Amino acid sequence: MALPIIIDCDPGHDDAIALVLALASPELEVKAITSSAGNQTPEKTLRNVLRMLTLLKRPDIPVAGGAVKPLMRELIIADNVHGESGLDGPALPEPSFAPQSGTAVELMAKTLRESAQPVTIVSTGPQTNVALLLNSHPELHTKIARIVIMGGAMGLGNWTPAAEFNIYVDPEAAEIVFQSGIPVVMAGLDVTHKAQIHAADIERFRDIGNPISTIVAELLDFFFEYHKDEKWGFVGAPLHDPCTIAWLLKPEIFTTVERWVGVETKGKYTQGMTVVDYYFLTGNKPNATVMVDVDRQGFVDLLAERLQYYA
């Protein structure tokens, strides 16, 4: 039986590729997709979800737009990484269908209520929508199997010295998620910076030769440019968000540890930092499965294998 999931995302090149991977995988049943503001403005990320589902010929999946700003802060976007549209690079189709009239939280709640089994929430943007769901529907917590997020880091940040972008945008929301009591799986920079796509991998995807693999290669062409900056020390481009879906499909290619994680919401220098109690110093019980390593080649091979689905 396929695993039911809800995807909450802010496309974003790597979010778009996470959608491609999820919808090429029969092990997963994508029951709904919601959009969050982050990589671009809320209007653009919602439009990008619709564009990707139009491309993938999946207008049957319910879509709803989410919160227009973080819980307690003004919105920060990453247009320097993802371009003016949020998905600069390839020529993507215009949306062929409209989102639902309700909010992301309403769609998530409806999906959870109607599901015969607990649903996994995959969140690849800021945690605003998920936190709003948890706060407004405590009766539905038992319908959530786990929350798999791309966000945070045990080590260095990528938006500030201490903070990863998704958590930095809405640290209060992330803290609600981590302290919810629901199992959390964290794909932070410790693992996603190892899930790099090299130039040769992009050509491998392009050579698969179907329309979707070509679009993925073109998305990566654009994404690759930002990560050429020598400050990062990367060989390729880290494919952050697909790590969440890849973990659901092939957990054996990832190394994880069980640890307590908290989010710093007020620090002068560390606002948005995920504090991972690696050495069990706080006495707090672990609340998260934290990814720390990945078999990079296995990750690339999984992407290439699933791109064949679109032949």
UniProtKB/Swiss-Prot annotation:
GO terms for biological process: nucleobase-containing small molecule interconversion; purine nucleoside catabolic process; pyrimidine nucleobase metabolic process. Keywords: Glycosidase, Hydrolase. Its EC number is 3.2.-.-. It comes from the Bacteria. The active site is at H240. One of its GO terms (molecular function) is purine nucleosidase activity. Belongs to the IUNH family. RihA subfamily. This is Pyrimidine-specific ribonucleoside hydrolase RihA. The gene is rihA.
